[in-house]
């Protein structure tokens, strides 16, 4: 149990802080020159300020560097008269008055807020089993490769050690001047710039994090060993900063003083500091930060009101994950595959937070805000090799024949390398492999493979979900050259977005995260992927009360944070597990929509559909290379339109066919009546008469799902009923569901039953056949009677004639 000395930030007047920042920056630059000539053996060395009696009274000495027994005096003199004005002038008096008022305000704020201080309990740190195991076992007989050596394939055997990070001595120049400058061994430096500016320094036993934005006060966290005697910049009469410590580490927290006390900010910061001290595994920090992000989304959506407590807590997990990962790499080893997964996951996570939780979050259909993530920028000496690992792996993987890659792990590695390189390389990340297979084709083949497995009810595990998710992201990250392939891929995802796929254990959000956290594994949003996340289905609403309403319990989060689209919704059970039973994504703002996909891959819809009624779209799919079917809740113009019968009075569904001609004839303005008929399921059709047809299923409550028949095997499976290997056909129940059969020419047939008569028989056709047959019977009878009478008449006439001659 540790009691913080004070839970209040220290602040200086704005002008004084700016001047001090300039002074410390200059001192740090000059001190770096001295460090090049000094050799230090300690991890942390303090830098003391001094005053020389020979220096004029109005001159301020900033710093003198002392490293071990070497007394390298580096003096920087600043003239107070130049900085604050000459003595006995109004400018100097005003500056001193501002400074005095600042001291009085901060002292009063400390006194007022310190009454709310509570003990901070820091538990015993949980051991990092990965680090412990590697310290005991070591890399074994495998050689640790230096950064300049190319990684091998598969990546499990390519190990890297301390040379990856290139640790070196640098001066820590505190942006908020919480501590006087000191020297430490830095492993890496991370800078995130955008609406939120976040800087992280990680070194041997030293960690620092600073978070700031235009609308919030800066927050700083500095962790150092308890044995380090570091000087603080506070005035002696001030209480200390927020101070939390464990058995080996002390943490200073500095929040710039604002106009009001923010308990949520302090609570979030304390929780993040406790997690930093208690959790030693980098994967656990990534999992905890992702869970925090998901909770924030489920509660508030992608709001444009900056939530500093959440961002500070997420940033602490982000920085702690990198700090622990750097320690693992420096003290033992990490594999190229681990570097690849960690770098891509944390980069994606940082972009998602910037995209969804900043004041400049994009409006509907707008481009994402500009942001930049720099890892190991090289300032002060950190190697660039870490962020180049994804590209190095991509280069190695291109030498393989992607068309022959069947291992799920290798597929995931290649896809992740592409995702980790696309921001830096752009179109160069989409160059083909040695056998000419481009990333779009590679991703599409993986999606096709999983589609054929999933429609047959095959279960998926974590690696399968991550691979399918990565394939979809690679395919959609840049516009595909082949529009027919893109239409097929999106139709696959729409077919898979059904109630049956919702039974996949993948929707267990908390179970997935807890399993990852408990084993020290990295959790990312790819672990929550469902086909609905990339489906052309837009009826996923929080108010939906139907059997298929739970298909979005995981995909809604994925849709939002991966920049696709979101129309909200989740199971109340899942929301309760996530401590949010009141609001479930209801406030979420979509960052894309049906029109975005139509503009890219469905030109007939982009040109012909009335986009003023975009909100009425339930789903759309491609039925051919140039035609589509779209289901809406309101009638639309521009195509052949049908109203679905037998829905509730509160649910109106309209099915419309669009092709390149954009029908504007008068018939297109009226609603066509869907004829009813029977579909034969007897035997398999060698010609595959149903290929290119779609079967839509709906009930009294609304749309359920859709299936597109593409192959003769799928048509044969349709005939097998409960024995079919395809889940959609096994669940067919015409007594409860209604089915609409749609073809590629714009015709729609309501299926009354599946019989063994003819391929597709309309009831009017049956009546016509019956009437025609009956008429034929009468005609035959009449003809027979006429012939009989004719011949009998001729026979009688012949007899009479014979009698006459006789």
Curated annotation (Swiss-Prot):
Pfam families: Herpes_glycoH_C (PF17488)
Modification comment: N-glycosylated, O-glycosylated, and sialylated.
Ranges of the Intravirion topological domain: 786-806
Domain of life assignment: Viruses
Membrane topology: Single-pass type I membrane protein
Ranges annotated as spanning the membrane: 765-785
InterPro entries: Herpes_gH, Herpes_glycoH_C, Herpes_glycoH_C_sf
Primary residence: virion
Glycan-bearing residues: 88, 267, 659, 723
S-S pairs: none
Localisation: Virion membrane; Host cell membrane; Host endosome membrane
Virion surface side: 41-764
Segments forming a coiled coil: none
GO-annotated cellular components: host cell endosome membrane; host cell plasma membrane; membrane; viral envelope; virion membrane
Gene Ontology BP annotations: fusion of virus membrane with host plasma membrane; symbiont entry into host cell
Annotated keywords: Fusion of virus membrane with host cell membrane, Fusion of virus membrane with host membrane, Glycoprotein, Host cell membrane, Host endosome, Host membrane, Membrane, Sialic acid, Signal, Transmembrane, Transmembrane helix, Viral envelope protein, Viral penetration into host cytoplasm, Virion, Virus entry into host cell
Signal peptide: 1-40
Protein family (similarity comment): Belongs to the herpesviridae glycoprotein H family.
Record-linked HAMAP family: HSV_GH (MF_04033)
Subunit and interaction comment: Interacts with glycoprotein L (gL); this interaction is necessary for the correct processing and cell surface expression of gH. The heterodimer gH/gL seems to interact with gB trimers during fusion.
Biological role: The heterodimer glycoprotein H-glycoprotein L is required for the fusion of viral and plasma membranes leading to virus entry into the host cell. Following initial binding to host receptor, membrane fusion is mediated by the fusion machinery composed of gB and the heterodimer gH/gL. May also be involved in the fusion between the virion envelope and the outer nuclear membrane during virion morphogenesis.
Protein name: Envelope glycoprotein H
UniProt source species: Psittacid herpesvirus 1 (isolate Amazon parrot/-/97-0001/1997)
């Amino acid at each position: 149990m540790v009691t913080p000395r004070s839970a209040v930030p220290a602040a200086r007047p704005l002008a004084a802080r700016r001047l001090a920042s300039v002074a410390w920056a200059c001192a740090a630059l000059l001190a770096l020159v001295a460090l090049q000539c000094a050799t230090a053996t300690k991890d942390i060395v303090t830098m003391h300020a001094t005053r020389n009696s020979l220096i004029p009274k109005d001159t301020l000495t900033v710093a003198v560097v002392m490293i071990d027994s070497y007394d390298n005096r580096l003096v920087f003199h600043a003239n107070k008269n130049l900085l604050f004005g000459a003595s006995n002038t109004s400018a100097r008096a005003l500056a001193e008055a501002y400074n005095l008022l600042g001291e009085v305000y901060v002292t009063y704020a400390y006194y007022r807020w310190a009454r709310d201080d509570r003990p901070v309990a820091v538990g015993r740190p949980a051991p990092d089993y990965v680090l412990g195991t590697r310290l005991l076992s070591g890399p074994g007989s495998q050689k640790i490769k230096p950064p300049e050596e190319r990684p091998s394939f598969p990546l499990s055997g390519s190990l890297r050690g301390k040379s990856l990070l290139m640790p070196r001595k640098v001066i820590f120049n505190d942006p908020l001047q919480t501590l006087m400058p000191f020297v430490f061994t830095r492993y890496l430096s991370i800078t995130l710039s955008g609406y939120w500016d976040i800087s992280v320094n990680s070194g041997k036993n030293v960690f620092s994090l600073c978070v700031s934005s235009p609308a919030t006060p800066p927050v700083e966290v500095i962790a150092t060993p308890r044995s380090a005697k570091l000087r603080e910049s506070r005035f002696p009469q001030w209480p200390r900063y927020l101070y939390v410590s464990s058995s080996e580490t002390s943490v200073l927290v500095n929040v710039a003083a604002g106009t009001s006390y923010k308990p949520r900010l302090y609570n979030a910061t304390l929780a993040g500091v406790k997690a930093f001290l208690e959790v030693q595994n980098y994967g656990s920090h990534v999992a905890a930060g992702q869970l925090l992000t998901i909770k924030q989304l489920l509660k508030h959506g992608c709001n444009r009101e900056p939530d500093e407590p959440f961002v500070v807590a997420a940033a602490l997990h982000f920085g702690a994950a990198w700090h622990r990962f750097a320690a693992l790499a420096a003290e033992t080893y990490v594999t190229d595959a681990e570097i690849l997964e960690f770098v891509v996951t944390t980069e994606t996570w940082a972009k998602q937070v910037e995209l969804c939780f900043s004041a400049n979050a994009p409006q509907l259909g707008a481009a994402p805000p500009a942001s930049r993530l720099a890892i190991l920028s090289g300032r002060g000496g950190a190697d660039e090799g870490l962020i180049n690992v994804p590209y190095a792996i991509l280069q190695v993987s291109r030498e393989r024949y992607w068309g022959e890659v069947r291992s799920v792990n290798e597929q995931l590695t290649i896809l992740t390398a592409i995702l980790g390189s696309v921001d830096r390389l752009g179109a160069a990340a989409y160059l083909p492999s040695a056998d000419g297979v481009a990333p779009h084709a590679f991703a599409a083949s993986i999606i096709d493979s999983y589609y054929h497995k999933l429609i047959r009810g095959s279960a998926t595990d974590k690696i399968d979900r991550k691979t399918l998710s990565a394939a979809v992201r690679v395919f959609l990250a840049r516009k595909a050259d082949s529009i027919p392939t893109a239409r097929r891929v999106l139709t696959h995802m729409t077919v898979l977005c059904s109630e049956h796929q919702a039974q996949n254990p993948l929707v267990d959000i908390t179970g997935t995260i807890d399993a990852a956290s408990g084993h020290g594994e990295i959790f990312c949003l790819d672990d929550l992927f469902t086909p609905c996340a990339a489906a052309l289905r837009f009826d996923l609403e929080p108010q939906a009360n139907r059997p298929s309403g739970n298909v979005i319990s995981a995909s809604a989060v994925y849709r939002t944070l991966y920049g696709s689209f979101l129309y909200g919704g989740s199971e109340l059970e899942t929301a309760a597990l996530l401590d949010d039973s009141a609001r479930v994504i209801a406030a979420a703002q979509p960052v894309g929509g049906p029109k975005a996909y139509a503009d890219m891959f469905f030109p007939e819809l982009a040109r012909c559909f009335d986009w003023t009624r975009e909100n009425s779209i339930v789903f759309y799919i491609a039925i051919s290379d140039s035609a589509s079917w779209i289901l809406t809740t309101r009638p639309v113009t521009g195509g052949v339109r049908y109203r679905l019968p037998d829905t509730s009075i509160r649910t109106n569904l309209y099915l419309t066919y669009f092709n390149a001609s954009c029908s504007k004839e008068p018939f297109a303005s009226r609603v066509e009546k869907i004829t009813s008929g029977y579909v034969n399921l007897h035997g398999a059709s060698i010609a595959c008469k149903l290929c290119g047809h779609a079967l839509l299923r709906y009930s009294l409550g609304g749309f359920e799902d859709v299936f597109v028949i593409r192959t003769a095997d799928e048509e044969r499976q349709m005939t097998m009923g409960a024995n079919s290997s395809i889940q959609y056909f096994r669940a067919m129940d015409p007594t409860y569901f209604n089915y609409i059969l749609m073809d590629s020419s714009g015709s729609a047939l309501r299926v009354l039953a599946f019989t063994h008569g003819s391929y597709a028989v309309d009831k009017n056709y049956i009546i016509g056949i019956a009437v025609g047959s009956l008429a034929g019977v009468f005609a035959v009878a009449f003809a027979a009677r006429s012939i009989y009478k004719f011949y009998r008449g001729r026979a009688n006439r012949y007899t009479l004639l014979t009698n006459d001659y006789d």
